[in-house]
Amino acid sequence: MDGFDRSNAPVEYQRVEWISDIFVFGMGVCWLINYAGMIYTSLQEQTYSMAPLALCCNFAWEMVYGLIYPSKSRIEQGVFLAGLVVNLGVMYTAIRFAPNEWAHAPLVMNNITLIFALGVLGSLTGHLALAAEIGPALGYSWGAVACQLLLSVGGFCQLLGRSSSRGASYTLWLSRFIGSGCVVGFAILRYMYWSEAFNWLNSPLVLWSLGVFIAVDSLYGICLWNVKKYEHGQERSNARKAQ
C-alpha cells in the first residue's frame, strides 16, 4: 500500500484524517513563519539563519516532493508548494549575505553562489536517487528525516560556532521546533491507524532520529538563551562604561 495514496487508507485512518490534516496545516503555518522570519532576519542583520547544507537539502526536498512526486493530499501539496515559493526568498537572502560570514575564508566567500548551486544539485540528485531506490512514498519520509537532522545539527553547530545570536531568534527556533513537532503528530496518527503503510515508522532508525531531533533542538533553545543572556550582559557592561 502506497502511503501517498489516501484513497486506499483504511476506515480507521479516514476517521482521524482530519486530525492529521490539522497537524499538516500546523506544520505548514509554522514553517512559513520560519521562512518569513529567516528572510526578515537576513535582511535586518545581513547574514543567513539556516546552515547552508541544511538549506540546500531542504530546498531540494521541497522541489522533489512539491513538483516531481507531488502528494495526493491537496493540503499537503499546498503546504509544500507554498514552502517552496517562500524558500526561494530564503535562498536568495542566504546567497546575498553569506559572504559576510566567510571573510576569513576567501575561497568560500568568493564562490558562494557556486557552493549553493552545487549543494542544491547534489541534494536534488540525492533525493531523486533515494526515491528511485525505495519509492517516492518512503523517499519522501526518509528524505525529510535527513533534512531534519541536518537542520537540527547544522543550526546547533552554527549557533555554537558563531557564539552569537546573529541570525537566530526564539521565533525562528520555536517555529521550527513546533513545525517539526507537527510532523511527529501526523506520523504517529498514520502509524497507529494505517499501520499497513506506516509500520516502518516504529523502526530503530526512525526512533533514533526522533530522539536526536528532540535532544538537539532542545539544547539549541537552552544555548540560545545562554548566548542572549551573555550578549545582554555585555550590552549593559558597555553601556555603563560609556557613561
Curated annotation (Swiss-Prot):
- The principal localisation class reads membrane
What are the alphabetically sorted keywords of the record? Answer: Glycoprotein, Lyase, Membrane, Transmembrane, Transmembrane helix
Please name every pair of cysteines joined by a disulfide bond in this record: none
Any one Pfam family here would be: Pyr4-TMTC
Q: Which subcellular locations apply to this protein?
A: Membrane
Q: Does the keyword Lyase apply?
A: yes
Its EC number is 4.2.3.-
Alphabetical list of InterPro entries matching this protein: PaxB-like
TM annotation in the entry = 19-39, 50-70, 75-95, 112-132, 134-154, 169-189, 205-225
Q: How does it sit in the membrane?
A: Multi-pass membrane protein
The protein's enzyme class: lyase
The record's PANTHER family line, in alphabetical order, gives: PTHR42038, TERPENE CYCLASE AUSL
Belongs to which family? Belongs to the paxB family.
Question: In UniProt terms, what function does this protein have?
Answer: Terpene cyclase; part of the gene cluster that mediates the biosynthesis of the indole diterpenes nodulisporic acids (NA). Nodulisporic acid A (NAA) and its chemically modified derivatives are of particular significance because of their highly potent insecticidal activity against blood-feeding arthropods and lack of observable adverse effects on mammals, in particular the tremogenicity associated with the paspaline-derived IDTs is not observed.
What is the official name of this protein in its record? Terpene cyclase nodB
Which organism is this protein's natural source?
A: Hypoxylon pulicicidum
